Amino acid sequence: MKHFEANFDGLVGPTHNYAGLSFGNVASLSNAALVSNPKAAAKQGLQKAKALADMGIVQGMLAPQERPDLYTLRRIGFSGSDANVLKQAAKEAPILLNACCSASSMWTANAATVSPSADTRDGKLHFTPANLVDKLHRSIEPLTTGRILTATFNDPHYFHHHSHLPEHNSFGDEGAANHTRLCKEYGHAGVELFVYGQEATNPNAPKPQKYPARQTLEASMAVARLHQLEDDNCVFIQQNPDVIDQGVFHNDVIAVGNQNVLFYHEQAFLNTQQKIDEIKRKLDTELYFIEVPTAKVTIQDAVKSYLFNTQIITLASGEMAIIAPTDCQENPAVLAYLNELLTLNTPIKQVLYFDVKQSMQNGGGPACLRLRVAMNEKEITAVNQHTLLNDALFNRLNTWIEKHYRDRLTTQDLADPQLIIESRTALDELSQIMKLGSVYQFQK
């Protein structure tokens, strides 16, 4: 049976804006109050996904969340008509309104952690939505994320869906952005790397001082237990607290893996050699550890260009390619390194550049926009087929974006009651296009 790694990219929602909500995310904060273009953002993401589908990669799409989130605004005391709720919130608590209008669910690397059936004791694909408790605007996502994932991976014979972890900082969980998987072939049992920022229950353990560590060891271990992983399938690695304090808020900003390749910055982890040795013990195959030295790419350049927030994909030829943002081309040190990388003895033989600037300006590169799901042929057949990207779905989604999305949005526009109507009309139509059923609150 054939095995693949599918990518499920998040469709950018109609309220994509730059509100600077993510403390610890340098790009998000530095671009706060820019005028956004939701239509361009959605099309950039869709075009990147289609390009991968055209390369033969199994590519799916995940629906965005309903925003503005009036249900959260009502929970915190705003009342009256929908328009009045927005008006009150804009006047009395504009930062809370911004949080309830964020399109951050586009970054599906944070949607969930996924363990393929080759790794799990029950032989099913496991999904645990991330609780995202560290950021208010993301902490309101998990319940809807779970519904969207269940509507997408909708056959319980193959897919096991868990609830998100308890909503407490001790179990801070940011999903696949702090998780990668190494293996010989996608269908073989692999080693899942769980990267954490701190131990919540050990006050003496290292942790960052300036920015929060969003992922705890306790959360990572809980997900591994839920997913029925054996010790031989897991390696728990602490991210270097110093790089978190330099803006590396998720591990996918400083490292990325694919099959037998781990591509990472020399400052990415604590106890790097010890953990590499553990990976080698647990995974008996030829491995490529590509360590990028600070002398060639500084942490600042890595964060600014998102060198590591790239996708590494395996092409039909067996060679690997890096899917990079055009920002990597615009950074001389990073471009020089990537050109050098292609001359080294590794499986990576191509670098392909994509313009995802609308996402980049909010702190999310190509890797943020996708959730990786290693699957076999039967599992792919069991997925909701209306979520898999082909020419027909691409054209329908492109038309849908053109019809429903604005090409200009400011944070002041978030108080416009018309935005509620536009967003709900768009999502209602999308849920029919993708045959999702009633995944949104307004549909219940």
Swiss-Prot record:
Keyword Hydrolase: yes
Pfam families: AstB (PF04996)
Binding site for substrate: 19-28, 110, 137-138, 214, 252, 362
Reaction(s) catalysed by this chain's protein: N(2)-succinyl-L-arginine + 2 H2O + 2 H(+) = N(2)-succinyl-L-ornithine + 2 NH4(+) + CO2
Active site: 174, 250, 368 (nucleophile)
Keywords: Arginine metabolism, Hydrolase
Coiled coil regions, renumbered to chain: none
Statement: the UniProt record of this protein carries the keyword Hydrolase: yes
InterPro entries in the cross-refs: AstB_sf, SuccinylArg_d-Hdrlase_AstB
GO molecular function: N-succinylarginine dihydrolase activity
Pathway membership, UniProt: Amino-acid degradation; L-arginine degradation via AST pathway; L-glutamate and succinate from L-arginine: step 2/5
Enzyme Commission no: 3.5.3.23
GO biological process: arginine catabolic process to glutamate; arginine catabolic process to succinate
Similarity-based family: Belongs to the succinylarginine dihydrolase family.
Described purpose of this protein according to its UniProt entry: Catalyzes the hydrolysis of N(2)-succinylarginine into N(2)-succinylornithine, ammonia and CO(2).
Self-association and partners: Homodimer.
NCBIfam families given in the database record: arg_catab_astB, PRK13281.1
Name of the protein described by the UniProt record: N-succinylarginine dihydrolase
Organism: Shewanella putrefaciens (strain CN-32 / ATCC BAA-453)
Lineage: Bacteria, Pseudomonadati, Pseudomonadota, Gammaproteobacteria, Alteromonadales
